[in-house]
């Protein structure tokens, strides 16, 4: 990532560390997915969230050579082959996160410094934000939710394939420049008005049917961040570096401008960061056929 782009990105996402106790979060009991899911139909997760299938096979990962906005950490473009998996159709909402808290006693999604950057009113979640993506969650919060739901965070490669499809494109919807018909972006903080209900942008969905893969909130993925990882990434089912100090954020938040909306954008973040522009979605292995 270029130094200019890196500086802009950090200015967007950096805030005080989110600290606090975490309760044990065991996944709810649930039977195996239906046979329809094994055949490639949409899957409903244990948390009730719809998931879309992403078929096995290769896709081109990383930015094409000569991209006008490409950062160093987005090169080189390389073919990656993934096994079939499922990914949440939508970002995890406040409503679903509330059910997680009720079931586990987990901590609330709150900004560590500025109460004005919260969507929840103390321990209460206003009904008006139930369908908006949860924010003020760090990487460990996201991991705990996905584990509770019987799922996991997507790998960086899984996230990019779900956003990208198998054909060359800059944005989830294709190569048409972003507009407010495609995504929620280029906003300033206005409380709950800043975020849109998940799935609001039909024109912006990905080739596999995932919504908000650009805009609304940045999304945690499983991988540790390494700016040179693409130079040594295995060609099949890459899992990211074995260790690191920062995790990867993908997508783009409500405050970003066009250059960062691209599906190739990689951002590093302290895994303890909680802020008003970061959320997540979950993924799951495909059930055996």
Please place each PLM-identified region on the residue numbering.
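Short, structured beta-strand segments at or near domain termini in extracellular proteins/domains
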Residues: 275-289
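Bacterial N-terminal signal peptides that target proteins for export
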Residues: 1-9
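Functional-site microenvironments in short loops/helix caps that host divalent-cation chemistry
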Residues: 60, 64-69, 107, 112-267, ...
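Boundary at the C-terminal end of the N-terminal hydrophobic targeting segment
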Residues: 23-25
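Bacterial N-terminal signal peptides
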Residues: 10-18
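A short glycine-rich, aromatic-capped structural motif
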Residues: 42-114, 137-140, 214-215, 286
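Residues embedded in well-ordered beta-strands
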Residues: 52, 79, 170, 219, ...
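N-terminal pre-domain segments of enzymes
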Residues: 27-44
């Amino acid at each position: 990532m270029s130094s200019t782009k890196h500086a802009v990105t950090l200015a967007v996402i950096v805030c005080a560390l989110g600290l606090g106790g975490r309760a044990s979060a065991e996944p709810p009991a649930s039977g195996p997915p239906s046979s329809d899911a094994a055949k490639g139909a949409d899957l409903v997760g244990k948390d009730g969230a719809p998931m879309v299938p992403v078929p096995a096979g290769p896709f081109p990962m990383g930015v094409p050579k000569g991209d006008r906005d490409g950062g160093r950490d987005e090169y080189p473009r390389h073919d990656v082959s993934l096994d079939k998996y499922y990914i949440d159709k939508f970002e995890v909402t406040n409503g679903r996160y509330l059910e997680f808290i009720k079931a586990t006693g987990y901590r609330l999604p709150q900004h560590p410094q500025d109460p004005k950057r919260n969507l929840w009113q103390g321990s209460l979640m206003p009904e008006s934000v139930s369908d908006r993506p949860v924010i003020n969650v760090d990487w460990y919060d996201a991991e705990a939710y996905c584990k509770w739901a019987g799922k996991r965070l997507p790998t960086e490669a899984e996230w990019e394939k779900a956003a990208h499809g198998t054909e060359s494109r800059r944005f989830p919807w294709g190569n048409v420049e972003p507009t407010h018909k495609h995504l929620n972006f280029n906003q300033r903080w206005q409380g709950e008005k800043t975020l849109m209900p998940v799935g609001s942008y039909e024109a912006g969905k990905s080739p596999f049917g995932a919504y908000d893969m650009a805009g609304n909130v940045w999304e945690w993925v499983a991988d540790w961040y390494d700016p040179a990882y693409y130079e040594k990434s295995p060609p099949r089912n890459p899992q990211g570096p074995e260790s690191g100090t920062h995790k990867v954020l993908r997508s783009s938040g409500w405050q970003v401008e066009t250059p960062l909306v691209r599906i190739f954008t990689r951002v590093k973040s302290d895994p303890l960061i909680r802020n008003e522009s970061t959320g997540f979605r979950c993924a799951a292995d495909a059930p055996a056929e």
